[in-house]
Amino acid sequence: MNIEKALMNYYELTLASYEDSTNRYHYRIVQHLIKGLKYIKVKKLEKVDITIGYKLIDYLKNHTHNGNNSIKKIINYLRKVMQHYRITTSIIDLPHLPNDTKPFERFYHDDLELIMTYTKNLNSSKNSITYKSFIRLLLDSGLRVSEALNIKISDMDFKNKVIRVLSSKTRKQRYAPFSSFSLKYIKELIEVNPKRDYLFYNFIKDRQTNKNDIKLFYKRLKKHLNLERIHTHRFRKTFASILIENGLNIDDLQKIFDHSRIETTIKYVQHNEKRALQEYKKYNDWGLN
């Protein structure tokens, strides 16, 4: 089977399963694979084995700007294509590259207070209202960035304090919670222009807020507050960790996140060592003499 044709066919087949931003990312992966496999002179998908896998990794390291984490995603995409066409070779035995980036850490109280105070004191411009409500809702709901940006005003259920969400990963519908912590700011944002479709809106550019807008705002936060690696995933980890610290059952958190495996949910929960040692003292009664 011709590699370029197989890759493009699989990409087109899966378009409906993902949102636009993910499809654009997958397209870049496909282009890397087409160029890399052409460079190492492999034309047939059936010829892609563990040796070709090593050569492809070498190409990606030396001819692109991809790090280990990105290369792993490219290789995994190739494996999915081969699996789709029921082609099994020794590439399944190709070892995983080590991670070359640190995982995102949760925010702790001092940093959260800095962020919330800064956003609360933003000016009264329409875009400032967008950003302050966005930050509040991230912490209050644990949403992924794509899920939050795609919320429509009609998705908000203020009576039950839930949001109808289309999962950016599974494409399934679920409901995410929110509370009075973000309610006031969301209502303020809607009142600015209640006739638009999407909740988060770039009023300067007259369009839906996008990921690049959020990245630019995070850079602004980082500069003004001197904080490292501000990212939506850190708010998601903070959401999970604080809820568990406050007594939420891990099974309930799994349902909120709509994870199929509880092991995935556990990865989001992060405590500091001091707190863990203090909590140990509350429960270390073994009932023995």
UniProtKB/Swiss-Prot annotation:
Q: Which GO terms describe its biological process?
A: DNA integration; DNA recombination; establishment of integrated proviral latency; symbiont entry into host cell; viral genome integration into host DNA
Q: Which UniProt keywords apply?
A: DNA integration, DNA recombination, DNA-binding, Hydrolase, Transferase, Viral genome integration, Virus entry into host cell
Q: What are the residue boundaries of the Core-binding (CB) domain, all occurrences included?
A: 1-86
* UniProt cross-references to Gene3D superfamilies, sorted A to Z: Intergrase catalytic core
Q: What family is this protein classified in?
A: Belongs to the 'phage' integrase family.
Function according to Swiss-Prot or TrEMBL: May function as an integrase.
Q: What is this protein called?
A: Probable integrase/recombinase
Q: Which species does this protein come from?
A: Acholeplasma phage L2 (Bacteriophage L2)
